[in-house]
């Protein structure tokens, strides 16, 4: 348990940041789920729109420090590969 005022304040700050970061991470997962659903349905147009939104949200999380840059890039790369595969299959 924190004994001095500075440590108590740090605990309060950490709790606030954790709440914000959890919300951001949840938002990213929501957009990733929308992309997954579009891929599962096989709808290329919806998947492309969902990809743009998911990529934007992932990169925003990276810039805010919620997701490591390499993790964000890896996820975007894998999403793009899946979209490309779906696009080829549909064509």
From Swiss-Prot:
Q: Set out the biological process GO terms recorded for this chain's protein.
A: translation
Keywords for the protein's UniProt record, in alphabetical order: Ribonucleoprotein, Ribosomal protein, RNA-binding, rRNA-binding
GO CC terms in record: cytosol; small ribosomal subunit
Q: Which GO terms describe its molecular function?
A: small ribosomal subunit rRNA binding; structural constituent of ribosome
User: Where does the secretion signal sit in this chain?
Assistant: none
Q: Quick check: keyword Transit peptide in the entry?
A: no
Could you confirm whether the keyword RNA-binding appears in this record? Answer: yes
Per its UniProt record, what Gene3D superfamilies does this chain match? Ribosomal protein S20
The UniProt entry's sequence similarity note says:
Belongs to the bacterial ribosomal protein bS20 family.
The record's annotation in NCBIfam families points to: S20
Q: What does this protein do?
A: Binds directly to 16S ribosomal RNA.
Check the record and name the PANTHER family matching this protein: 30S RIBOSOMAL PROTEIN S20, SMALL RIBOSOMAL SUBUNIT PROTEIN BS20C
Q: State the protein's name.
A: Small ribosomal subunit protein bS20
Gene name per UniProt:
rpsT
